[in-house]
Every structure is written in C-alpha cells, then in structure tokens.
Amino acid sequence: MAKINLVRIDSRLIHGQVITKWLKMSGANRIIIVDDELAKDDFMSIIYTTAAPKDVSVEILSVEDAKKGWMENELGNGNLLILFKDIKTCYELKNEGVNIENIQIGGLP
C-alpha cells in the first residue's frame, strides 16, 4: 500500500517549484499525475517523465486507471506525490473512493 504524502492541484504539473520544494518536503519517491488527456499523449508524457529527478518514478494515469490502481492495491508501494491539472479531476477521483484527505492548491488558470 502506497502512502499519499501530498496531493497538489497545479495546472503546470511538474515544474521547478514542485521538484525543488514540494517533492523534497513531502518525502515522495513516486509522482503520479492523474489526467485523462495527458495519459493519451505519449510525447508530453515523455516530457513530464524526464522532468523529474532520476531517483523519482513518474506515472501518468487516466482517472479510470488511477481508480483501478487504488481499488486493486492502493496504488502499490512508496511515498506518493499525486498531481492534478485541475480541481474537477481531483474531485472526480476522490468521489471514486481514493483516500484524499488534504489538498494543496498551486497555480491554476
């Protein structure tokens, strides 16, 4: 069972502040981005995956895949930083039963 260390809503997803401050502060060793559009975009997925430090794994999941991962084994192992591009997606996943207790709001359009 993974431990959700930080849930952040930020339209920029992985960027300097997330990597230099929030990743270290949260102690996460895995980043999960939940976004239906990004999960279908191989090129942008590579961009976001390579933006993280080499010792941090990045997974990009659709809402449905994140829900399945939570129901099957609570998203596996490790300490998680879960990123959402918008409030709607975070709300949708919480309503599907994912244990989101606290949410940090970052840059939104």
Question: Locations of the language-model features?
Answer:
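N-terminal intrinsically disordered, cationic/polar leader segments
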Residues: 3-6, 11-25, 30, 38-40, ...
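Short, well-ordered alpha-helical microsegments
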Residues: 16, 67, 90-91
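Short glycine-/acidic-enriched loop or helix-start segments at secondary-structure transitions
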Residues: 43, 70, 91-94
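N-terminal active-site wall of soluble small-molecule enzyme domains
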Residues: 63-72
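A polyampholytic, Gly/Pro-enriched intrinsically disordered region
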Residues: 78-86
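Long, charge-patterned amphipathic alpha-helical coiled-coil/hairpin "stalk" segments used as oligomerization
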Residues: 85-109
